[in-house]
């Protein structure tokens, strides 16, 4: 049996592909959750709050809530990505650092 090692760039491409696939799966799950669970629930809450609203007004309110929640999720995602890239930079910023070297008087 022959073992084939992946080069560094191929390995990073595979990791990025898996990461992208996980984002796509998460996107499908969130869209399904919103479509079948949250939207009817929000519709029900809005009917209870103000039954005099027409369907058009209610749909406008649901669209506003959907856009607002998307904005919050998107900002959270950007914040998470920012922290992730900062931690990657700080961990790999000093390639000459030796963990086994002792500094000072021992």
Curated annotation (Swiss-Prot):
It comes from Saccharomyces cerevisiae (strain ATCC 204508 / S288c). The chain crosses the membrane at residues 25-45, 62-82. Keywords: Membrane, Transmembrane, Transmembrane helix. It is a multi-pass membrane protein. Partially overlaps HAC1. GO terms for cellular component: membrane. It is found in: Membrane. This is Putative uncharacterized protein YFL032W. The keyword Transmembrane applies. It comes from the Eukaryota.
């Amino acid at each position: 049996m022959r073992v084939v090692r992946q080069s560094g760039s191929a390995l990073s491409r595979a990791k990025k592909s898996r990461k992208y696939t996980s984002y796509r799966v998460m996107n499908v799950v969130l869209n399904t959750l919103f479509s079948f669970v949250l939207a009817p629930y929000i519709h029900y809450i809005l009917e209870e709050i103000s039954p005099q609203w027409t369907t058009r007004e209610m749909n406008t309110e649901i669209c506003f809530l959907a856009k607002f929640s998307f904005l919050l999720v998107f900002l959270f995602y950007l914040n998470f990505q920012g922290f992730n890239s900062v931690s990657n930079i700080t961990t790999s910023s000093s390639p000459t650092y030796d963990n086994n070297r002792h500094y000072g008087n021992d």
